[in-house]
Amino acid sequence: MSEVLSLEEKKKRIAELNKSFSKKYGESGMVRMGTEVMKVEPISTGILGLDLALGKPMPRGRAVSISGTESSCKTTTALTTIATEMKNNKEAFCYYADVEQALDTDYAESLGVDLSRLVVDSTSVGEEALTKLRDSIASGLYSIAVLDSTNAICASKQEESDITATEMAIRARLLATTYPQLINACGKTNTLLIVIEQIRKKVGVMFGNPESTTVGEAGKFFMTQRIMMRRQTKVEEEGGVAISNEVKCSVIKNKVAPPFRKCDLVCIYGKGFDKITDTANLAIDFDIVQDKGHSYKKGTPEEKKWKSKDEFIKYLSSNEDFYEEIRKATLEKYNNSDQTLIMQDDDDIDRKNAEKEKFEDLAVTSKDNSMISDGSDEFKEGE
């Protein structure tokens, strides 16, 4: 039978045990009770709607994956995050593993990325690219590291083999071996790793979601946050010229805030995400600006009115101080709100309300018929 210890005696023995670990293995990894707290420091994506959907923006020292269909602005999201970090931290350097060899540096610069502080590596051989990425993260010199993308990684065995040869899951096995090393390096150096993934459809799937990433299941478990991005519709000018995409972002995994939140964004070709429209939509959603049906209105401290949503957005874009005021008010309203209900689709909320009403109806019926008297009857889903 184990010895019964008092609280103070337990603290004393834990301190002695930690001291012995420190002597044997060094100070790395040990957290002292009541003296050190492992806090998660967020890095803003620079996209207000996505930051709010994430709850806490992308965390330093962790890995985040961005998956999605083609032209769903995955690379733009990563570059916008880099640009925001460089703007907020003038000493920040970032590393970009351009395995796809498709990075447009002019576009990156137009988004606000300082190319003099961006190191780009275009190695396509998997082992070499991942080794460089791991060592770059482990150096502690970079605030953000990006892998774009896992699907473009070509293992040396594939590169040397005949073009008709097939090797099952070679990329997935390579990444499954590398991910623990990358995550360990991120944690030690407080570096954010952004992994960009493409999605494919499984053959022969009759039920459930046929979509999957092509790098196996291992990566999903190492990610602190997973973002799924889908292109919805393209916006056209008069004459049928496409000028932007509407993109839906879904947070399908989140270890630092509630998951399954969503947001809708607009990405303008050649310019990046439309932050003005994003902020305007959020201000209306949070009732900072009231939708009166025939007009839009903001009350205190100074009343303002606009005849249409487009007029409100145009006013925001031409008044930087007012834009910052609206943005701060939206953030404040978000921080003081019930965050479990916001950033969800109306369909999600309607579905949950319907399920709640159905359960309440069942409970009332059961009570009227005296079917539930001692709790012995279990409610089974589907009955």
Regions found by a protein language model. Give the residues of each.
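Short amphipathic alpha-helices and their capping/turn segments at secondary-structure boundaries
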Residues: 129-145, 182
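Flexible beta-alpha connector loops of hexameric P-loop NTPases
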Residues: 6, 116-126, 158-174, 206-211, ...
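N-terminal cationic and glycine-rich segments that engage phosphates or anionic surfaces
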Residues: 16-19, 34, 158, 201-206, ...
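Conserved P-loop NTPase "ATPase switch" module shared by AAA+ and STAND
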Residues: 141-159
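The Walker A/P-loop phosphate-binding site
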Residues: 3, 7-117, 134-138
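Loop/turn-to-beta-strand initiation segments
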Residues: 91-93, 141-144, 188-194
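Phosphate-binding/switch region of NTP-binding enzymes
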Residues: 136, 168-286
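Terminal-proximal interaction/regulatory segments of ATP-powered molecular machines
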Residues: 294-383
